């Protein structure tokens, strides 16, 4: 394990993707030859923000964790920087599983995927294709990437203008033209690109804490990120998910990924499946605050139940 002033419970690792990028993360080793989870954060968020607390709980319960930054942001390679590419992030999950299966002390037949918000959906999307995956934990997943309808025509026009500018720069001889970056959220708590999953003045006010916690966090994305989000329908292949067990943790007052969309999606899943429902929690309230301990207990129990063959199709929690 690495030491830096205080003892850390993880080692720093890197692994290659199929297209040659180095993705970087943390490996929290749990029980020898035991189960493991691949974890990634949500939209443009880096691995240092909040979810290390969850990784440490899994580790203390014998579950190893590979927590990594997807391509294009954080400590991982990939260009353009700050371009969120959810389809490629699904592939990053594939390659993270390949890496984790090769690590000593990991049971290669007991690896699950974990995601929250945007990555909660990409984890499901990855598991639809990758049958090496033993289970999925999806925390308040973004079921559909929606935009403010009145802004969509302007967003589409900005996307095309950006492509024109990048082509013009390459025509003029630039090898790596710099893309236009836009803030994730403005001072009044609205995405300048009308992306519904990023909103709320509280979210804007938390940005300094994010940057203090993770100096490599950048509170902006490329314009073309939103082209990729407009085209993204991550859960169109859910018919392929079964028989991989999934646990969804759903807040009853989700102000980012509408609660009813999550509930409807859960009901449509072919199973096996388990739901934990938290009536009084919002999107950011499951991994922060007083609910955290119970939320983590439910996730640890799910992993243990799946591996022990005790998995029930559905349970509830408040």
From Swiss-Prot:
It catalyses: aculene D + L-prolyl-[peptidyl-carrier protein] = aculene B + holo-[peptidyl-carrier protein]; aculene C + L-prolyl-[peptidyl-carrier protein] = aculene A + holo-[peptidyl-carrier protein]. Disruption phenotype: Abolishes the production of aculenes A and B and accumulates aculenes C and D. Keywords: Hydrolase. GO terms for molecular function: hydrolase activity. The gene is aneE. Signal peptide: none annotated. Gene3D superfamilies: 1.10.10.800, alpha/beta hydrolase (3.40.50.1820). Belongs to the polyketide transferase af380 family. Pathway: Secondary metabolite biosynthesis. Its EC number is 3.1.-.-. The keyword Hydrolase applies. The keyword Transmembrane helix does not apply. It comes from the Eukaryota. Thiohydrolase; part of the gene cluster that mediates the biosynthesis of aculenes, a unique type of norsesquiterpenes that contain a nordaucane skeleton linked to an L-proline moiety and are of mixed biosynthetic origin. The pathway begins with the synthesis of dauca-4,7-diene by the terpene cyclase aneC using farnesyl pyrophosphate (FPP) as substrate. This is Thiohydrolase aneE. It comes from Aspergillus aculeatus (strain ATCC 16872 / CBS 172.66 / WB 5094). InterPro entries: AB_hydrolase_fold, Hydrolase_4, Polyketide_trans_af380. It is an enzyme of class 3 (hydrolase).
């Amino acid at each position: 394990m690495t030491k830096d002033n205080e003892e850390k419970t993880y080692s720093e690792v890197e692994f290659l993707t199929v297209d040659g990028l180095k993705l970087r993360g943390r490996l929290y080793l749990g029980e020898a030859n035991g189960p493991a989870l691949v974890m990634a954060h949500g939209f443009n968020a880096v691995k240092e923000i909040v979810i290390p607390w969850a990784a440490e709980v899994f580790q203390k319960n014998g579950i190893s964790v590979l927590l990594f930054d997807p391509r294009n942001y954080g400590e991982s390679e990939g260009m353009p920087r700050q371009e969120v590419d959810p389809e490629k992030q699904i592939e990053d999950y594939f390659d993270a599983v390949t890496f984790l299966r090769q690590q000593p002390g990991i049971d290669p037949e007991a690896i699950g995927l974990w995601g929250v918000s945007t990555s909660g959906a990409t984890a499901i999307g990855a598991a639809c294709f990758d049958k090496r995956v033993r289970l999925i934990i999806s925390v308040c997943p973004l079921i559909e990437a929606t935009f403010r309808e009145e802004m969509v025509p302007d967003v589409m026009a900005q996307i095309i203008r950006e492509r024109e500018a990048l082509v013009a720069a390459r025509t003029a001889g630039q090898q790596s033209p710099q893309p236009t970056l836009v803030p994730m959220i403005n001072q009044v708590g609205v995405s300048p690109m009308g992306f519904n999953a990023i909103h709320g003045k509280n979210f804007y006010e938390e940005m300094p804490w994010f940057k203090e916690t993770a100096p490599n966090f950048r509170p902006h994305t490329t314009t073309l990120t939103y082209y990729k989000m407009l085209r993204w329908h991550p859960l169109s292949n859910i018919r392929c998910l079964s028989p991989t067990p999934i646990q969804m943790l759903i807040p009853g007052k989700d102000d980012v990924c509408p609660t009813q969309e999550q509930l409807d999606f859960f009901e449509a899943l072919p199973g096996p499946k388990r739901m934990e429902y938290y009536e009084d929690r919002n999107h950011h309230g499951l991994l922060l605050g007083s609910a955290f301990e119970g939320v983590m207990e439910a996730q640890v129990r799910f992993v243990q139940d799946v591996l022990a063959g005790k998995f029930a199709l559905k349970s509830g929690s408040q």
